[in-house]
């Protein structure tokens, strides 16, 4: 169509190089269960057993079957998409247990009333101690005796004029931790500690007084007001009503210089018309010798851990960002400590530390990255969230005026200092476990994998059995339903544990095991998107130092991963060459030939242990009951492979023009890929139709694009017949064979 209105040349480019199909780099299995820890109701990608332990914890007695199925699959080179089921577990918090399923719930405000809370649910969080520390106190003074007042924040001075506030006092050792007004002028053992607070009045001055009436004489008065108690004065007044003298009868206690006390008029004689104001001009305080001095930060132990604050990092101070704005004392450290060893294996291990964070909500590190402590912890910590404001803050000097944590630098002025935390410790508690998920909870967890657009998986693993056969069947049917609904993956299902292993009494006979297994699988829907196996293997659980029976659905899926890695998706995973099951001491049910015949006819792939070969997957059927090319694993996986790649290419055709060029580009790319599959023994022949015969004008007018693929899949050998014929010596073989 003309696009110019005057003579000229238009150059156009058409890109047909984007029609490329890329093979899968990894195979992922969907899996859901209860765990020791980890986010709930969220799909997490796991690529190794080490990562499985790190994110979801080690297996416990109640979830070991599930956990080890997942671990065995990972051992074959697969990856997992894991969902932790929502059960009755709670996160450990600073105030009480609370359920915070995942990061999204935390961001929505769930559990934010806790100062700190374990990042995921489970009793594991009860072992956590969170330590937040800033520059804190400056020194620890060992005094000759205990001061009268040792409350947090009490102002004090030394005889030489050094001052500050009290942070803490240990009565057993007379050790007083102090925050100095001027940290550059440290207290030494030569200094004398002046009792903080108030003292005994030693000198008073009477204010102006104009009384009327006969007030002459000396009157003993107990004045009111001031910061102390117990002061008693003798006030002498002449006949004219003038105060001629004030004498201290009792100096009281806890008064401060400059206090003004009131002598009521009624106490000064008959006819007095006004009160007398008296100023305390001097007080006497007790002085205490300083026996020794040491640095607070490097000598302060984190209670109950045996660790010093210096184990977290050097003393925090003021960041470059704050200093450039004239602010001070914004830096702080946060550490998470495993007090019991339940998380790390060793008690009082520092699990993680965040150093040189900022109390400024807009704080930045020296590299320019985010430094506000709340944001850094909530975004980067593997163990905790930080919610409510930290408690027990203290003024940075006796002058007061400390700024609140979380202030923005734009709201502060040069010279401002932040309130100090010194050492703020929080022990988390209230975390609970609940490994025994119900059938409903299992179904809800697997439902996260229903969405094909947002979650790409190749397999769905059933995992272990549940408490009852009916619950196990419900779980199995859900796994199969997910795969059948998605139509882009295979479900792998094992029988109920009780079908093959007796929980009490005598062991089950082979006939009982076969009958139980067949009865269980009879209820499974016929579909080519599922694979059924007969196996429970006996293996060692290194985490709990015991042997367990574990279902083999993770192994069978793992064999598919292995065959895809070493050969191709369309090669059968069964047999002596490729079907070896790993980590097998023995099988709970080792079916003989008669058992295998019944199992295979019922869509169940036997797992067999032959002498000298170990345990082997000895069948490659899908769960499809009707005879079909899709009743074999390799054919179903062949079509899944081709369908996924054709779908990816077809998405690139969307919104293009349905013309010969587009159809040819699509056709040539599909033919190229199928030729490669054919060369690798996946198919014996194929035909792709994508031209004007099936993209008619009517199809084009409906904005449709049609392609048809005809494929002859390669078939695996399931039945071998070898005939031996004995002949007489003089007989020619051509006569016997007939050729």
Give the location of each predicted region:
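Short amphipathic beta-strand/extended segments with alternating polar/hydrophobic composition
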Residues: 100-105, 125-133, 165-169, 192, ...
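Structured, mid-chain assembly/scaffold modules that mediate subunit interfaces
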Residues: 60-140, 147, 165, 177-195, ...
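Short, ordered beta-strand-loop transition motifs
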Residues: 35-37, 100-112, 134-139, 167-175, ...
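Structured, hydrophobic secondary-structure cores that serve as assembly/anchoring elements
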Residues: 1-105, 114-119, 328-333, 338-341, ...
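Beta-strand-rich solenoidal segments
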Residues: 292, 298-378
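Conserved, function-critical positions that sit in or immediately flank catalytic
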Residues: 141-290
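Short, surface-exposed beta-strand/loop "edge" segments at domain boundaries and coil↔beta transitions
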Residues: 17-18, 37-42, 52-53, 89-92, ...
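Broad, structure-driven detector of short, well-ordered beta-strand segments within folded domains
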Residues: 126-134, 231-235, 274-278, 307-310, ...
């Amino acid at each position: 169509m003309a696009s110019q209105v005057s003579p000229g040349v238009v150059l156009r480019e058409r890109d047909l190089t984007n029609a490329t199909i890329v093979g899968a780099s990894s195979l992922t299995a969907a899996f859901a269960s209860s765990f020791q820890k980890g986010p709930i109701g969220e799909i997490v990608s796991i690529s190794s057993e080490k990562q499985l332990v790190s994110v979801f914890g080690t297996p416990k007695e109640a979830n070991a079957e599930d956990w080890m199925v997942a671990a065995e699959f990972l051992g074959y080179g697969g990856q997992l998409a894991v969902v932790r089921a929502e059960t009755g577990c709670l996160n450990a918090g600073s105030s009480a247990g609370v359920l915070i399923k995942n990061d999204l719930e935390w961001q929505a405000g769930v559990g934010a009333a806790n100062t700190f809370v374990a990042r995921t649910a489970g009793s594991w969080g009860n072992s956590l101690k969170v330590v937040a520390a800033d520059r804190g106190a400056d020194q620890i003074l060992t005094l000759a005796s205990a001061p009268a007042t040792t409350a947090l924040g009490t102002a004090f001075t030394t005889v030489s004029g050094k001052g500050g506030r009290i942070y803490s006092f240990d009565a057993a050792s007379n050790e007083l931790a102090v925050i100095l007004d001027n940290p550059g002028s440290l207290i030494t053992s030569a200094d004398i500690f002046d009792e903080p607070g108030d003292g005994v009045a030693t000198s008073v001055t009477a204010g102006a007084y104009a009384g009327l009436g006969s007030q002459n004489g000396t009157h003993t008065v107990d004045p009111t007001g001031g910061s102390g108690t117990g002061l008693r004065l003798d006030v002498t007044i002449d006949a004219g009503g003038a105060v001629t003298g004030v004498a201290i009868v009792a100096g009281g206690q806890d008064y401060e210089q400059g206090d003004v006390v009131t002598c009521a008029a009624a106490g000064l004689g008959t006819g007095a018309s006004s009160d007398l104001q008296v100023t305390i001009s001097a007080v006497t305080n007790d002085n205490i010798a300083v026996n020794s001095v040491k640095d607070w930060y490097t000598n302060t132990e984190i209670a109950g851990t045996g660790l010093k604050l210096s184990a977290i990092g050097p003393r925090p101070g003021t960041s470059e960002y704050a200093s450039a704005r004239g602010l001070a004392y914004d830096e702080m450290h946060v550490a998470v400590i495993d007090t019991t060893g339940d998380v790390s294996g060793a008690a009082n291990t520092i699990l993680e530390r965040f150093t040189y964070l900022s109390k400024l909500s807009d704080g930045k590190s020296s590299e320019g990255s985010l430094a506000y402590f709340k944001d850094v912890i909530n975004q980067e910590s593997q163990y905790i969230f930080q919610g409510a404001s930290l408690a027990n803050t203290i003024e940075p000097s006796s002058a007061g005026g400390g700024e609140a944590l979380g202030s923005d630098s734009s709201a502060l002025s040069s010279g401002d200092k932040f309130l100090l935390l010194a050492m703020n410790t929080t022990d988390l508690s209230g975390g609970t476990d609940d490994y025994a998920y119900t059938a409903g909870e299992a179904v809800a967890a697997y439902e996260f994998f229903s969405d094909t657009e947002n979650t790409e998986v190749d397999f769905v693993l059933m995992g272990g059995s549940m408490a009852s056969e009916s619950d196990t069947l419900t779980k199995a049917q859900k796994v199969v339903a997910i795969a059948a609904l998605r139509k882009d993956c295979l479900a792998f299902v094992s029988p109920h544990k009780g079908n093959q292993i007796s929980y009490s009494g005598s062991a089950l006979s082979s006939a009982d095991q076969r009958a139980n297994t067949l009865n269980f699988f009879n209820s499974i829907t016929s579909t080519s998107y599922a694979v059924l196996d007969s196996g429970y293997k006996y293996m060692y659980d290194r985490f709990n130092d015991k042997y367990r029976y574990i279902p083999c659905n993770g192994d069978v899926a793992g064999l598919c991963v292995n065959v895809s890695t070493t050969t191709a998706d369309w090669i059968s995973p069964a047999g002596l060459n490729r079907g070896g099951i790993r980590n097998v001491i023995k099988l709970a049910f080792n079916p003989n030939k008669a058992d295998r015949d019944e199992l295979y006819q019922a869509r169940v792939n036997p797992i067999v242990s032959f002498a000298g070969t170990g345990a082997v997957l000895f069948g490659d059927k899908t769960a499809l009951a009707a005879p079909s090319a899709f009743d074999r694993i390799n054919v179903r996986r062949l079509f899944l492979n081709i369908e996924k790649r054709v779908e990816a290419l077809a998405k690139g055709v969307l919104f293009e023009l349905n013309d010969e060029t587009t159809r040819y580009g699509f056709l040539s790319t599909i033919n190229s890929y199928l030729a490669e599959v054919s060369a690798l023994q996946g198919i014996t022949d194929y035909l792709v139709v994508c031209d004007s015969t099936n993209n008619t004008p009517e199809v084009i007018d409906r904005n449709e694009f049609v392609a048809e693929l005809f494929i002859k899949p390669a078939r695996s050998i399931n039945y071998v017949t070898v005939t031996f014929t004995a002949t007489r010596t003089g007989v020619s073989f051509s006569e016997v064979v007939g050729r």
